[in-house]
Amino acid sequence: MNEADDQQEIIRLEQARCRALVEADIDSLQKLVSDDVVHVHANGKTDNKAAYLAMVGTQIRFLEAGREALDVRVYGNTAIATGRLDQLIEMTQTAQRIDMHVMTTQVWVRHGANWQQASFQATNL
């Protein structure tokens, strides 16, 4: 693959990750994020893979998750993706809905032929 193909693949995978959040598709998320992922929420809370998947499966319902333009820079087997992420979530315990608008930085790492998200950082807009 060339750099342009890798950029498009990261964009496709991020779209798949957003879709998996809305569908609560834990199996797909399991494949998309690396075992050592560090997921930093906009409030500063940090999750490892197990905590991130548990949060998606039990604590938050993603009603919408969408991306505006995503800028992807590829450095060999590492890619950095930055862009705006808009989400409408519902807290499962309280049914409180939160409309979130964040800027994210993600690090994707290629393991063999597959890319996985190794880091996610969100900042409220």
Q: Where in this protein do the model-derived segments appear?
A:
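A beta-strand edge to alpha-helix "cap/lid" segment located at domain peripheries
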Residues: M1-K31, D36-L125
